[in-house]
Amino acid sequence: MSIKLKQRFVPQLAAINCQFEEDFAQMLKTVDTSHIKEKTVVKGQVIEIKNDMIIVDVGLKNEGRIPKSEFLSLPEVGDVVEVFIEKIEGRNGRTILSREKAVKEELWGQLEIMCSKGEFVDGTIFGRVKGGFTVDLSGVVAFLPGSQVDVRPIKDPTSIMNIKQPFKILSMDKKLGNIVVSRRVILEESRSEARDEMLSKIKEGIVLEGVVKNITDYGAFIDLGSVDGLLHLTDISWGRVNHPSEVLEFNQKVKVMVIKFDEKTKRISLGIKQLDSNPWDAIKEEFPVGKKMTGKVTNFADYGVFLELKDGLEGLVHSSEISWLKSNQNPRKMLTIGQEVEFIVLEVDTEKHRVSLSIKQCQENPLIKFAENNPIGTIIKAPIRNITDFGIFVVLGNNMDGMIHEGDISWEDNGTDLLKSYKKGDEIECKVLAINFEKEQVSLGIKQLLPNPYQKISDEYKKSTIVKAVVTEIKDDGLVVLLNNKVTGFIKRVELSDEKDEQKPEMFKVHEEIDAKVVSIEKSTGRVLLSIKAHKIAERQKTLKEYGSSDNTTNMGDILANVLEEKK
């Protein structure tokens, strides 16, 4: 009686067709399975498919189970497949196998060969990680550093994701399971030859077609195929362009002219506006200085407003040329975008591509009319518009203001204190003091309505006059004195003597009478400023002049001593 044996799968015997079980059993005894080790790839036979598991026999005592999910295409019973042996005998006695790891082992080996030969591998970028991207190399995940993505920074990485493309393996570490790849190396190699060929054809003046590759604040980079060129902001249009994104967009096809090519640095400068004739060539004839025209407000700036002269051409109205009397006001508060206004051409600079315009010069200067009706010295009445720390602003009509400085409120009292006695809306009487057409200012005064009480003092105490004064107060910075018992004077410390060590106020006494020279009169207070030093210097010069022709043997000190003695 023969014994029925289970036919165990043995790779070495898989191709042998045994007719008798006894023969198979005998041959099985001679097969050595010691070469089958853990963490290796071996061949096995599918012996059963049960639910979601594939049962595989690799020639060991026990079969192994592999989830169906590990197979890209499901095998059939009897098929021979390569599997990875995780463990020869697991907890439940079964052999632990993996189809997925077997595939990866096979791929890893192929990748190692390609890496050693420097061959490119196909892969797909499918995810982003810190510092770069993940790439699927037909089942093996590799790392693509951000620096190895492209020859230039990519603004939109999604444009290169989920697309099968070639990569070069930079390094492999099987122990750690790490693979680092590069896309940039391939691009550099492929672009190098094409770049050299393209650069050999580049000449200033030729027209090319390109694609907007990147947009910056200062311009746009245009991909000309294998080389890039810079389209500067100022070379996009003859008109004003604030930012390239106003007229260009990513991946837009454009026609450009090579306006400069540096053969040493290989830098290419491009232009779009150069494809058209320069509108500035005939601008002076079209917009002569002094011509009155109309245009629409197109844009505002901190320093003025831009008006459209014609398509693609604008002129600037400086803030000071918008209104006669509101030169410091924000242009946005006086005009609106799209508003049509009348202007006069002031200047055309074809080299700098600038046209200066004026809105206010289309109108009569209201200050001229005011000056005709109110010459200097005219007394007017005007309501208070505003009060500040330094004076009062009053309404003169036609959006004009006049200013009364705090120093022009009163001859005697403190102007800053008097400001508190006025309020907005009060109508006050004042005199026109000055009209400055250049600064567009009208200066007014209240105290000028009355005679200057200090004028009499100025008439009585002329500059350089020698006067007698009595010390009434001693201060650290000088002496307060009284002239003729009615007018206050002051002598600064430095004016007390021509000798520095005698410039001490404490050397004088209250009620002491002194001689001094009038230096000046403070118009705001009527205080007379005096100098003892100037008086002494004048006396010395006078003495030298009188006695300068004396006997040369006479000592000058003796002369001065005698003069001083005579004056006692």
From Swiss-Prot:
Domain S1 motif: 39-100, 118-184, 205-273, 290-360, 377-447, 464-533
Keyword Ribosomal protein carried by entry: yes
Biological processes, Gene Ontology terms: translation
SMART domains assigned to the protein according to its UniProt record, in alphabetical order: S1
Family annotation (Pfam families): S1 (PF00575)
UniProt entry keywords in alphabetical sequence: Repeat, Ribonucleoprotein, Ribosomal protein, RNA-binding
Molecular function (Gene Ontology), one example: structural constituent of ribosome
Keyword Ribonucleoprotein: yes
GO cellular component, one term: cytosolic small ribosomal subunit
Record function comment: Binds mRNA; thus facilitating recognition of the initiation point. It is needed to translate mRNA with a short Shine-Dalgarno (SD) purine-rich sequence.
Similarity-based family: Belongs to the bacterial ribosomal protein bS1 family.
PANTHER family given in the database record: 30S RIBOSOMAL PROTEIN S1, SMALL RIBOSOMAL SUBUNIT PROTEIN BS1C
Protein name, entry field: Small ribosomal subunit protein bS1
Organism: Rickettsia prowazekii (strain Madrid E)
Taxonomic lineage from the root: Bacteria, Pseudomonadati, Pseudomonadota, Alphaproteobacteria, Rickettsiales
